[in-house]
Amino acid sequence: MGRYSLENYEKYKTIKIRPHPLPSNENHQKNGQFQYVTCSWKELEPTRGVYRLQEIEKALLAASNPVLVLQPDIPLWVKDHPSDCFAAFIRKVGSYIDSEGRLVGVVISTLADSKEEWNAYIDSFEHQNLLADLHNDILIRYLNGRRFGLLVKCNEENWMRCCEAFAKQNLQHVWKGSPVVLHVTDDGCGPHIRREAYRWHASHANSNAGLGYNLALRRLTHPETVSSNGSLPLRFWFVNTGISTIYDDFSLWVKLVKGNIAHEFPLQAATDSWLTGDFVHNEIIQLPVMQPGEYTLSFALFFNNRTHLQLNIGAKEQGGYYEAGTVKVEVTSVDPLLNIWDSYYPEGYYPLEDPKVPE
């Protein structure tokens, strides 16, 4: 460390953790390749008002990153107003599985492209990502102002037409709020499709195209020593080297462990704004009264259902928590770290006021 290294200007002794990044992320949960789960209206409602919706649940459990398609094949009992009947079926399915957390999205498939059918999807799948066909101009105009994702059916013949559809309908930023799902109709993912998939920030494809997010921790900075009932300042630096964001809500947690004693802390990280590239989160945690000694510091990213987000780092993981290092807890009369960031910038250690003019 050189004479003028920024570490020399730290206000307290810190430890910097830099996990080794893995060469590739092989975690395909909520990422990468998807599978269609196609459900037949005729089979799931063979008699009016009699449903076999448990079949959907079985199919979802068997699929990896399922994308739901409600196939509008008309049952024999339907005599009049088939689109209205299908809309009622959509609402029934939505009420049954809207809270299902495993779905990548639900394709908006209809009989007549009617507003009643579209509204059935919008109203019934409130917590799911609705996927509109990129080339269904009328539907996309109707969804304008609402949150929706895209299903892009493309190949090496029509990839330019897909690019034109993105441009004409101003869909370049859809990926920031909802997934762009790629359906490659060729046998494999050709060079044009692969290149454009990166431009469209596609999160999933029906073939292995290396899409989705790839989240890692670049650095975690924490103090060597903290006070019982004091403050723990933490500085996280994450990076998403993938091409899409993470569409399910998740939160950042920290845990301190000493023997059988464990303390968990939820952090206030704005993870909904984490897209691609680098992002930092700085936070000072208020610690409870703790026994003095050395604690293992771990961190985790949990989805709302408490499943953990797998990071692309070479670090020991247990129960979703990645081990980062150790922190020494002492009993002190004052908390020296309570207002530690009030007088200097923690990422650069620069003073928050202009230096005085030399005499």
Q: Which residue ranges define each predicted feature?
A:
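Catalytic-core regions of glycoside hydrolase
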Residues: G2-N25, R102-N206
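Short amphipathic alpha-helices and their capping/turn segments at secondary-structure boundaries
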Residues: S24-H28, Q54-S64, R91-D98, Q286-L287
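Aromatic-lined substrate-binding rim segments of carbohydrate-active enzymes
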Residues: H28-H81, C85, E117-N129
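Conserved, mostly hydrophobic/aromatic
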Residues: Q35, A63, V93, V106, ...
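A mature extracytoplasmic/lumenal domain signature
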Residues: L70-P72, T110, L301
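Hydrophobic alpha-helical segments with transmembrane-like composition
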Residues: C85-I97, L103-A112
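Extracellular/luminal regions of secreted and cell-surface proteins that mediate adhesion/ECM remodeling
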Residues: L211-E359
